[in-house]
UniProtKB/Swiss-Prot annotation:
Any Pfam family hit: GPI2
Medical condition linked: Glycosylphosphatidylinositol biosynthesis defect 16: An autosomal recessive disorder characterized by delayed psychomotor development, intellectual disability, and seizures.
Topological type in the membrane: Multi-pass membrane protein
Function noted in UniProt: Part of the glycosylphosphatidylinositol-N-acetylglucosaminyltransferase (GPI-GnT) complex that catalyzes the transfer of N-acetylglucosamine from UDP-N-acetylglucosamine to phosphatidylinositol and participates in the first step of GPI biosynthesis.
Protein name: Phosphatidylinositol N-acetylglucosaminyltransferase subunit C
Length: 297
């Protein structure tokens, strides 16, 4: 009994189909099997200095938290007069408001329909409301131990940093939650200050540094990048200097943290990008890019 001749597989063109019998073994892999494979077709090529520039948003927010804590410590120790902080804060807010309006060119005001008089009324209402409730804020947490207040403040400030909008499109980002956590931390810390006036000024300062300051920074970053870099450096040096007056070890550790985020992390991101292999091919899930809203009405 003679064996039947085996068909020469070199003369038969291999096809990537499952519904047709082909004269190839089950473990046969053709050279054209992965011809449609594509790697990193949607990968973004990062530049080092561009990543360093974007990391400044994180630096700004860390410095904001540091400055807030330093100012609170100075007021708690009686080294900073509340009237001086209030006057400086109001003057800085006025300068920032004018600067924001000059950079924006009035475009945001035209879109929202908000006038300067309306902005002034909103500011007066907030100041009056906060001042009226400052005795309540001062006595709000009297029944809570100081250690618990400090722990809650640390937790809330960490949550503020985690949920802050750094420009990433992620589900964890929540500007409202981030701001509320920062204000809650400021209320907790303000309740441990000597007088109601201190609590009022501390909460007002928290609104300025956690709500108004990031808005100005985003506008500077979008319109005047060079000025934004200069302001970021000045703000970082101010935060480190303020912390240095309290704790030299803390200032060194904070400076190392800022350097790591602004220099080392972008460097490692660029290096790790060399090892990225994201494959694409006909096996990918189909993406419907057509607008189907007309079928839902």
């Amino acid at each position: 009994m003679y064996a039947q001749p085996v068909t020469n597989t070199k003369e038969v063109k291999w096809q990537k189909v499952l519904y047709e019998r082909q004269p190839f073994p089950d473990n046969y892999v053709d050279r054209r099997f992965l011809e449609e494979l594509r790697k990193n077709i949607h990968a973004r090529k990062y530049q080092y200095w561009a990543v360093v520039f974007e990391s400044s948003v994180v630096i700004q927010q860390l410095c904001s938290v540091c400055v807030f804590v330093v100012i609170w410590w100075y007021m708690d120790e009686g080294l900073l007069a509340p009237h001086w902080l209030l006057g400086t804060g109001l003057a800085s807010s006025l300068i920032g408001y004018v600067l924001f309006d000059l950079i924006d060119g009035g475009e945001g005001r035209k879109k929202s329909g908000q006038t300067r008089w309306a902005d002034l009324k909103s500011a007066l209402v907030f100041i009056t409301f906060t001042y009226g409730f400052s005795p309540v804020l001062k006595t709000l947490t009297e029944s809570v131990s100081t250690d618990t207040i400090y722990a809650m403040s640390v937790f809330m400030l960490l949550g503020h940093l985690i949920f802050f909008d750094y420009g990433a499109n992620a589900a964890i980002v929540s500007s409202t939650l981030s701001l509320n956590m920062a204000i809650f931390a400021s209320v907790c810390l303000a309740s441990r200050l000597p007088r109601s006036l201190h609590a009022f000024i501390m909460v007002t300062f928290a609104i300025q540094i956690f709500a108004l300051w990031p808005m100005l920074q985003k506008k500077l970053k979008a319109c005047t990048p060079r000025s934004y870099v200069g302001v970021t450096l000045l703000f970082a040096f101010s935060a480190v200097g303020g912390l240095l007056s309290i704790s030299a070890v803390g200032a060194v550790l904070f400076a190392l943290l800022l350097m790591s985020i602004s220099c080392l992390c972008p460097f490692y991101l660029i290096r790790l990008q060399l090892f990225k292999e994201n494959i694409h091919g006909p096996w990918d899930e189909a993406e419907i890019k057509e607008d189907l809203s007309r079928f839902l009405s």
